[in-house]
Amino acid sequence: MPESLRTTGTELCITVNGTDVWLQGQGDEVVLMLHGWPDTRALWDGTVAALQDRCTCARLTLPGFESGPSATPLDDMCQLLRQIADRISPDKPVTLMLHDWGCLFGYEFAMRHPERVARVVAVDIGDHNSGALLRSWSTKQKLSVAGYQLWLALAWQLGQHVSVSLGNRMTRAMARWLRCPTDPARITCRMNYPYAMQWWGLAGGLKGAARVRLSMPLLYVYGTRKPFMFHSPKWLDALATREGCAVQGLPCGHWVMLSRPEAFHACVRDWLDGKTLSTSAT
């Protein structure tokens, strides 16, 4: 069997430009799943189990989070996602399922290559770089966001240039403070590079990221029990009234698919099946 194609149990693994992409399930619709901090493709284990009877689920661990380059520029990430989409679904556009930093990278890919994306399911990150979001935060919320993100960016920097052990300890401490459900043993400071891109311009930075204006249908699911939101009320209200789109708030924190798996997966299945959701925008 070629190195770029192998199987493990019920999963098929292909390698695209040095990145392993794992496929599982059946169906003509291909759902490409992108995680964020501080996760890996394992974030989607439950979601794959819930959807694999109706679609083919494809997932990867973002470059640099476990192995590979220390940081991936935005242009390179979009190019990689295009290569993956072309490989796993050459004849039809994919459905994106996104969380956290996966939303930022996935949104950018969808806006640059709309012909390759049929629709999007996004979790907990909306108009992340809009003026409306910044204006919606109180001073305390702005300081909270800057505080945790700069801490993680610093942990990445220290891990790269001073001590990996120190960087890892700082990262795991912040994950505990944020009540992250990910196994601490799997969390490392490598996973923090998007924060260094955001604040310090690492690997070209993220100032080139477009405002979030998707041309395809979008289901946006978010946790309502958080000290701050990553969407503006203006963006949420507009999305809730847009044809083909839906908004669903669930009583939990940032990791919606882990905190409220049954409700999340039922919502996603219904929307993918074309059912009208009882939209909840809080």
Residue ranges and their predicted role:
Residues 1-12:
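An N-terminal hydrophobic leader/cap segment in hydrolases
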Residues 14-24:
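A short loop-to-beta-strand scaffold at the N-terminal edge of the catalytic core in hydrolase folds
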Residues 24-67:
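Conserved HGGG/HGGXW glycine-rich cap/lid loop of the alpha/beta-hydrolase fold
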Residues 32-36, 99, 222-223:
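The conserved beta1-alpha1 loop
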Residues 37, 98-106, 258-261:
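Conserved beta-strand->loop/alpha-helix structural units within folded catalytic cores of enzymes
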Residues 43, 58, 63-95, 104-248, ...:
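Flexible "cap/lid" subdomain of the alpha/beta-hydrolase fold that forms the substrate-access gate
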Residues 84-88, 267-278:
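C-terminal alpha-helix
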Residues 252-261, 265:
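Catalytic histidine-centered segment of alpha/beta-hydrolase-like enzymes
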